[in-house]
UniProtKB/Swiss-Prot annotation:
GO terms for biological process: ribosomal large subunit assembly; translation. Gene3D superfamilies: 6.10.160.10, Ribosomal protein L20 (1.10.1900.20). NCBIfam families: rplT_bact (TIGR01032). InterPro entries: Ribosomal_bL20, RIBOSOMAL_L20_CS, Ribosomal_protein_bL20_C. CDD domains: Ribosomal_L20 (cd07026). Belongs to the bacterial ribosomal protein bL20 family. GO terms for molecular function: rRNA binding; structural constituent of ribosome. The gene is rplT. PROSITE patterns: RIBOSOMAL_L20. This is Large ribosomal subunit protein bL20.
Amino acid sequence: MARVKRSVNAKKKRREVLKSAKGYRGQRSRLYRKAKEQMLHSKTYEFRDRKARKNEFRKLWIQRINAGARQNGMTYNRLIQGLRLAEIEVDRKNLAELAVNDFDAFTALCEAAKAALPEDVNAPAAS
C-alpha cells in the first residue's frame, strides 16, 4: 500500500482553527490544542446563548409593557388579561414597541383592556 502523507491537510486544519481563534487571549489564540478546546467551548456557548436570547428579550418586553401599563394605572397582568377578554391579539414584542415609541396607541390599548375587565378586579375572570 502507498504511504499516506497528511502534512498538508493537518497544517490546513490547524491553520483554520488558529484563524477562527483569532482574538482570544493568551495561549488560546496561539497554541493549537488550547485553541481547539476554546473553539469547542465557544460553539457550546454560542448554541446555548442563541436559545437564552429569546428568553432575555421576552423579559425585556414584559418589563417595558409593565412600565407603560403602570403609567396608565394598570399592572402587566391586568393589561394582558384585559386584552384577552377584549379579544385583542397583540404580541408582547409589538406591545413593548408601542409602549416605547407610540405611547398614545398603547394608552388606547390600555383603555380597551380596562373596559373589558370585570368591575370587581379580585373576582376571577370570566372564561
